[in-house]
Amino acid sequence: MNYEDDNVESGQAGKSDAEYKADIANREKEVTKALNAGKPQDALNVALADPPIYTKTGAIKDQNATIVLNLLGSFKDKDVETSVETLNDDQLDILMKYVYRGLATGENSPIFFKWHECVLKKGGAGTIIRVISEKKTV
């Protein structure tokens, strides 16, 4: 990812909690709007944009993760690969972080394994290595 490690969890490159909360509220509206319009790919792009990786506030990360994980869980199995194919490397890394977070919940595991398979297929093992070695969490 194109973030500087010195800024990890320090808030230096991040926003205030109030700004993150406003962004998350807007993200939720945009994701819902895209889904209601039958545009799950647009919803995915919005959901993966600007994750709150620089905040130490777990509630903010949880709130954003809920939006992303609910979206990922709503995809039909057959649409996952098509959606992953349109993502760039940074989006793949962010998506893989959410996939691991989703798998950790133990809910909807089959769909998260499908996402994992497709991200790995497109991004290669480097995606996994970057995600597990990176300090910034979602």
Curated annotation (Swiss-Prot):
Name of one Pfam family that matches: P16-Arc
One GO cellular component term: cytosol
Chief location bin: cytoplasm
Disordered: annotated segments: 1-21
Any GO molecular function: actin filament binding
Domain of life: Eukaryota
SUPFAM superfamilies, alphabetized: Arp2/3 complex 16 kDa subunit ARPC5
Keyword Cytoplasm: yes
GO process annotations (BP): actin filament polymerization; actin nucleation; Arp2/3 complex-mediated actin nucleation; exocytosis; phagocytosis; regulation of actin filament polymerization
Keyword Cytoplasm recorded: yes
Keywords annotated in UniProt: Actin-binding, Cell projection, Cytoplasm, Cytoskeleton
Location of the protein in the cell: Cytoplasm, Cytoskeleton; Cytoplasm, Cytosol; Cytoplasm, Cell cortex; Cell projection, Pseudopodium
Subunit-level organization: Component of the Arp2/3 complex composed of arpB/Arp2, arpC/Arp3, arcA/p41-arc, arcB/p34-arc, arcC/p21-arc, arcD/p20-arc and arcE/p16-arc. Interacts with carmil (via the region between the LRR domain and COOH-terminal proline-rich domain); carmil is required for Arp2/3-dependent actin nucleation. Arp2/3 complex, MyoB, MyoC, and the alpha and beta subunits of capping protein all form a larger complex with carmil.
The family this protein is said to belong to: Belongs to the ARPC5 family.
Protein name: Actin-related protein 2/3 complex subunit 5
Native source organism of the sequence: Dictyostelium discoideum (Social amoeba)
